[in-house]
From Swiss-Prot:
This is 4-diphosphocytidyl-2-C-methyl-D-erythritol kinase. It comes from Bifidobacterium adolescentis (strain ATCC 15703 / DSM 20083 / NCTC 11814 / E194a). Belongs to the GHMP kinase family. IspE subfamily. The lineage of its organism: Bacteria, Bacillati, Actinomycetota, Actinomycetes, Bifidobacteriales. GO terms for biological process: isopentenyl diphosphate biosynthetic process, methylerythritol 4-phosphate pathway; terpenoid biosynthetic process. It holds the Pfam family GHMP_kinases_C. It catalyses: 4-CDP-2-C-methyl-D-erythritol + ATP = 4-CDP-2-C-methyl-D-erythritol 2-phosphate + ADP + H(+). It comes from the Bacteria. InterPro entries: GHMP_kinase_C_dom (IPR013750), GHMP_kinase_C_sf (IPR036554), GHMP_kinase_N_dom (IPR006204), IspE (IPR004424), Ribosomal_Su5_D2-typ_SF (IPR020568), Ribsml_uS5_D2-typ_fold_subgr (IPR014721).
């Protein structure tokens, strides 16, 4: 569940809300057949885990009738920085319009996104931005909607978005949008913890991006790898071989688990000790199999700040 951090504001109008929303990975990702009634999307059974790499979305109230605006900042914007990028297709903007329609508000809001989550990386950066926008507007517009209602809006936008509203651990079914929150002390999470899927981790990130439809199309052709908990890993590695090298290097250096995150190409390496973390980082640097290394922890959850 998200955390709200705010000063005492009484009945004053809220003018700006910032949300730090974490990335996600899939500790397991089992892919079933595609369904025409889902627009060709595949049936999924997955364990989501929120990872402590955060995008920050700030939603600021604008004058009535002035419309929306979008500003992106960050050192690793990828294709989002392209002059040809259509801001109306940005996930946060889509979330703004979906919330405006659902709540009968005008979308007179300035959105600023400070991106730290790798773009096109299988870590739901766009979904995190949409979820952050939904959480911010729930506070900015004083809706006070329960998380279940927010998830209904999020589910119309994409599979990962309902999970990104809460973070932590969850099981996703359907095409990923049906969320069952998992207790940190429950049997499923306890089993994953015993297998090394928790705690400190390293993210191996890349300048290259993978498009999710391309990865699924490749999966449809070649299927899943034997024993892969992520059924998309074989397809992602076939399209981006450096991810496979990063997995091998991490496991050889002492990672408890290493795998492609979602549809890739980012690689997650859980490291049980500080020595293992140092060894994996050195292995990745020496082999140049990743472009950027991010050290963090899991699980993580969104944080809402009332800023003005």
């Amino acid at each position: 569940m998200s955390t709200i951090d705010s000063p005492a504001i009484g009945t004053a109008t809220i003018n700006a809300v910032s949300v730090d929303c974490p990335a996600k990975t899939n500790l397991t990702l089992h892919v079933g057949p595609s369904h025409a009634e889902w627009g060709g999307r595949h049936e999924l059974d997955t364990i989501y885990c929120a990872v402590g790499v955060y995008d920050t979305v700030t939603a600021t109230r604008k004058a009535p009738g002035s419309g929306f605006s979008l500003n992106l900042e960050g050192a690793y914007l990828g294709d989002l920085a392209s002059s040809g990028s259509d801001m109306r297709r940005n996930h946060a903007v889509l979330a703004l319009f979906a919330m405006a329609e659902a709540s009968s508000h005008e979308p007179d809001v300035a959105l600023n996104i400070d991106k730290r989550i790798p773009v096109g990386a299988g870590m739901a950066g766009g979904s995190a931005d949409a979820a952050a926008t939904i959480l911010a507007l729930n506070t900015l517009w004083d809706l006070d909607w329960p998380i279940e209602r927010l998830q209904e809006v999020a589910a119309t936008l994409g599979a990962d978005m309902p999970f990104c509203l809460t973070g932590g651990y969850a099981r996703g079914t359907g095409f990923g949008e049906r969320i069952e929150q998992l207790d940190d002390d429950g049997d499923i999470v306890r089993d994953l913890t015993e297998r090394g899927f928790t705690g400190h981790l390293l993210v191996g990130a890349y300048r290259a991006e993978l498009r999710t439809p391309e990865v699924y199309a490749t999966f449809d052709q070649i299927g899943a790898g034997d024993g892969d908990e992520n059924h998309l890993q074989k397809a992602a590695v076939s399209l981006h071989p450096r991810s496979g090298q990063a997995i091998e290097e991490a496991l050889r250096a002492g990672a408890s688990q290493a795998f492609v995150s979602g549809s890739g190409p980012s690689v997650i390496a859980f490291v049980p000790t500080e020595d293992a973390a140092d060894a994996v980082q050195r292995a990745w640097q020496d082999s140049r199999c990743v472009d950027r290394i991010i050290a963090t922890n899991a699980p993580a959850r969104p944080i809402v700040h009332i800023t003005a």
